[in-house]
């Protein structure tokens, strides 16, 4: 969060940065296969109903890159809109869509691989120690999509350490 003051529509300005590393754990030498960098700046809005938090919505400008140049580059920018809604104590849904900003000839087919929207559903047990999630990314073709399945388990109630596994 960049400011504590409220902006119009009770929004706030924030920055984000994520980095994803893709590993091939079955390979003995050089198991790291790919890196992905994703900085962004956005406006956020908490969704409150009857004095209770039920979700959040974001409007962002994001950059995504594998850090390479020339023909190996997968760099692109996008304007994204996303929301997350808490359905009850155990279930949450998320949705994210984007408008790509593609610069000329570079990566003009990026939507073929990175899609046009994502939808996720997460389940968390009442004691908040086990969480299961599924994320579907719709690619350009109507019946083409990527799926991620995630499982995390919190070892100790008092610690913030998890066992996490993801299938992509």
PLM regions with names:
Residues 142-168:
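Predominantly the C-terminal beta-signal and adjacent terminal strand-loop region
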Residues 5-144, 166-167:
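Outer-membrane pore/translocation modules
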